[in-house]
Amino acid sequence: MTVKVFAPAKINLTLHVTGQREDGYHLLDSLVAFVDQGDQVTATPATVSALSVTGPFAQGVPTDSSNLVMLAAGLAGFPMSLTLDKRLPPASGIGGGSADAAATLRAAARLGAKPVIAEGALSLGADVPVCLGAKPVRMSGIGEALTPVSMPALHMVLVNPRVEVSTPEVFKSLESKTNAAMPEVLPDWPDSLSFIDWLSTQRNDLEAPAVKRVPEVAAALAALALAPGAQMLRMSGSGATCFALFENRYTADAAALQLADSNPWWWVKSASTLPG
């Protein structure tokens, strides 16, 4: 039996850094959505666990226990032969490694005909629990507190200037680690336009330090700002991937083509959010 599991990209529509624990973990308040761009994990029962990596971003991806996919496979309780089709750029702020680990846990559950192994997800990384659900949520704490959120559909263009950003270094550059959270009670958004208007009043607290450390992030944001029909733009996670929101997928597709043509070295994709 072979199973294929999609590992969708995680987009931080907002990311407020609200504190830091004594153990060094940062406290976050973030609206998270998942989109129809991502990696794919293929799993087959085997006598010994092994990982191979294919796809446009396969080069340099480790296949040993330093890869979250192999660590997730270790929680399965049985060996698997795994293939990771790496379509998302690495270290890019859209949860690629965490999404891959979560997809591996889901693949193991399907192969073993057992519930998804949720208990060990947080031990793999702060973003793995949210990626395991792959649904719109408000994520707080260090990533373990997940509250489902009803969000209107969003259409966007994702841009990564093909530079990797160190999450620890971005956090080190953050001027304040005790910033305001989102409102305790989130508003109702009757449509995408009202949602985008509200999102524009929120923040990604990691954007400014990322721009300071990595000028290419500023270049990506500037290019998105000039895209016809762009309604709001922001960096996702700790970067370097940035996104702009559009009225519909058609407009996003057109903008993505234009941006890719103007910046052939960049990773540019149009995307739509997945339903809850």
Q: What is the predicted role of each segment?
A:
Residues M1-S92, R110, N160:
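ATP-binding N-lobe of GHMP and related small-molecule kinases
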Residues A240-C242:
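Conserved glycine-rich beta-strand-loop-beta hairpin in the small C-terminal domain of fold type I
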Residues T18, L245-N248:
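Residue-level recognition of strand-loop junctions within catalytic nucleotide-signaling folds
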Residues F78-T83, R106-L124, N248-D261:
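Phosphate-handling active-site elements
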Residues L51, G133, R138-M232, E247-Y250, ...:
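Conserved, helical-rich catalytic subdomain that frames metal- and/or nucleotide-binding sites
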Residues S92-E119, V130:
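DPxDG-like acidic metal-binding loop motif
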